[in-house]
């Protein structure tokens, strides 16, 4: 082993890094493109987490500050009716999908969303000059509303996106904190599921554990866990399955500065200020927090209702939809308008206005539509490829019915001929085990596209976008030497005939320029 030893120090070579194969190294493209899209997907419900029971049914919580996570099921291309049966050899390779383009469309008008609390923990207005206070009352909570942090998030992968949040940590046994002291906190990770709350300007935390007053936050998140996408972990993921790409826009500014009620147990040191004269002890709080605001909502900065083309994913997986699954994670509170519904509380005709005769409800509605451009690819079953897939995602080989460990032949089993005959023992009442869903314990919006793929790109808006530019792009296409992208994908696009190749390259390069 080579080493360098200056003086008494010994320096060994660094530990080699385990290399992960890029999907471009073992994926062979077939130059066949399919289009798939969903119907108009609608949802409506109450903006709060309160369960309202009507005739043994529950009105779901539908808030603009929730994530929408779509789990898209694609057909198995190995059982697909292909236009050419000689495209692949089933004994030596398997077919997979690679996502080339995606468009997440949203309906409904833009509107700022307003959240608040009927009993908000605000003691003093700290942004303006406040009077001196010698004591706090028992309860001086106030009604407060605000337009929260504005954000749009779009993430695409073949596994669920990962979110992070802070929560209470288990204290050390030898150093258990006293009652009323600040607990230790830790960062935890979890899959972002459909219906999880976004950060709206108050941080990503488990407010079920950290909001004991139930008055420090808007009602929307007062008893929820707010997740923030863990971009650091997903970009460093070796396989690159959780996030092919992401787009986001966040904006927030401080609208008000308040101080909360409560006993401040972490007072600033006396060396930082001079005490007031006399024996009177002032109770001016030293804890401040901001009321966020998302400001203007405009169509100029919308991430949705436009196509995204994947020429090079950020990770080692360049858009391959393993297990024929895609996860689309959407967060958007720019369409946060709520419908205020008033109904009379009885059947009597109304002749004059009386507030006591009306019931007031609020509903929030959302509208989505997904569209994809998929390319047919094949994976050659070489030892290197099988070993790499077994290490990164073993479920791929299980779904392909590839067993790396042959069954043991030394065990003698009994097989009865007439197993259904009364003269033979009862057959084992054990049904064949079905493949387990690794995400069965998680909540997603299930989308089935197994019977909705089409080769006729010109019959769909996203497909026509690829085909509509016919004779205007020759002089606009950039040269390969000026850009960095996978060699296989470049050669693939050079083999695609006609305008499909032209438009894919043009749109991808224009997004990167």
Curated annotation (Swiss-Prot):
Recorded coiled-coil stretches: none
One Gene Ontology MF term: structural molecule activity
Pfam family, one: Late_protein_L1
Cross-referenced SUPFAM superfamilies: Group I dsDNA viruses (SSF88648)
Biological process per Gene Ontology, one example term: virion attachment to host cell
Main location (coarse class): virion
Subcellular locations according to the entry: Virion; Host nucleus
GO cellular component, one term: host cell nucleus
Classification via InterPro entries: Capsid_L1_Papillomavir, Capsid_L1_sf_Papillomavir, dsDNA_vir_gr_I_capsid
Keywords, sorted A to Z: Capsid protein, Disulfide bond, Host nucleus, Host-virus interaction, Late protein, T=7 icosahedral capsid protein, Viral attachment to host cell, Viral penetration into host cytoplasm, Virion, Virus endocytosis by host, Virus entry into host cell
Cited function: Forms an icosahedral capsid with a T=7 symmetry and a 50 nm diameter. The capsid is composed of 72 pentamers linked to each other by disulfide bonds and associated with L2 proteins. Binds to heparan sulfate proteoglycans on cell surface of basal layer keratinocytes to provide initial virion attachment. This binding mediates a conformational change in the virus capsid that facilitates efficient infection. The virion enters the host cell via endocytosis. During virus trafficking, L1 protein dissociates from the viral DNA and the genomic DNA is released to the host nucleus.
Family of this protein: Belongs to the papillomaviridae L1 protein family.
The protein's assembly and partners: Self-assembles into homopentamers. The capsid has an icosahedral symmetry and consists of 72 capsomers, with each capsomer being a pentamer of L1. Interacts with the minor capsid protein L2; this interaction is necessary for viral genome encapsidation. Interacts with protein E2; this interaction enhances E2-dependent replication and transcription activation.
UniProt name for this protein: Major capsid protein L1
């Amino acid at each position: 082993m080579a080493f360098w030893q200056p003086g008494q120090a010994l320096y060994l070579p660094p530990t080699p890094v385990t290399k992960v194969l890029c999907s471009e190294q073992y994926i062979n493209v077939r130059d066949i493109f399919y289009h798939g899209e969903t119907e108009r997907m609608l949802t409506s419900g109450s903006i709060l987490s309160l369960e309202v029971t009507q005739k043994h049914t529950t009105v779901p919580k539908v808030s603009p500050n929730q994530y929408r996570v779509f789990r898209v099921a694609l057909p198995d291309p190995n059982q697909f009716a292909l236009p050419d049966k000689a495209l692949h050899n089933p004994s030596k390779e398997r077919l997979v999908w690679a996502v080339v383009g995606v468009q997440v469309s949203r309906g409904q008008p833009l509107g700022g969303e307003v959240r608040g609390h009927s009993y908000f923990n605000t003691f003093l207005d700290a942004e303006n000059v406040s009077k001196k206070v010698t004591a706090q009352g028992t309860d001086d909570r106030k009604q407060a509303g605000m337009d929260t942090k504005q954000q749009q998030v779009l993430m695409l992968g073949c596994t669920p996106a990962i979110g992070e949040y802070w929560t209470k940590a288990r204290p050390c046994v030898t150093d258990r904190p006293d009652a009323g002291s600040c607990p230790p906190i830790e960062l935890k990770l979890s899959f972002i599921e459909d219906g999880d709350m976004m950060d709206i300007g108050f941080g990503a935390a488990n407010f079920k554990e950290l909001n004991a007053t139930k008055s420090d936050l808007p009602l929307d998140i007062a008893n929820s866990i707010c997740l923030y996408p863990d971009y650091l972990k997903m970009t460093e993921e070796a396989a690159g399955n959780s996030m092919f790409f992401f787009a986001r826009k966040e904006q927030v500014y401080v609208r008000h500065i308040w101080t909360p009620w409560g006993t401040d147990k972490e007072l600033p040191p006396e060396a930082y200020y001079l005490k007031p004269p006399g024996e009177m002890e002032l109770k001016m709080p030293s804890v401040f927090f901001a009321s966020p605001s998302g400001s203007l909502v405009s169509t100029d900065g919308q991430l949705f209702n436009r196509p995204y083309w994947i020429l090079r994913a950020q990770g080692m997986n360049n858009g391959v939809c393993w297990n024929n699954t895609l996860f689309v994670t959407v967060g958007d509170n720019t369409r946060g308008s709520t419908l205020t519904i008033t109904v009379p509380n009885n059947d009597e005709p109304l002749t004059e206005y009386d507030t006591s005769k009306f019931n007031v409800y609020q509903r929030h509605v959302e509208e989505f539509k997904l569209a994809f451009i998929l390319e047919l690819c094949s994976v050659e079953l070489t030892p290197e490829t099988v070993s790499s897939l077994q290490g990164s995602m073993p479920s791929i080989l299980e779904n392909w019915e590839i067993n790396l460990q042959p069954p043991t032949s030394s065990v003698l089993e009994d097989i009865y001929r007439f197993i259904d005959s009364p003269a033979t023992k009862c057959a084992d009442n054990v049904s064949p085990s079905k493949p387990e869903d690794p995400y069965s314990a998680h909540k997603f919006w299930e989308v089935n596209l197994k019977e909705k793929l089409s080769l006729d790109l010109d019959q769909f808006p996203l497909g026509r976008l690829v085909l509509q530019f016919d004779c205007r792009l020759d002089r606009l296409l950039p040269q390969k030497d000026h850009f960095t992208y996978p060699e296989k994908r470049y050669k693939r696009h050079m083999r695609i005939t006609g305008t499909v190749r032209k438009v894919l390259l043009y749109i991808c390069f224009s997004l990167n320029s």
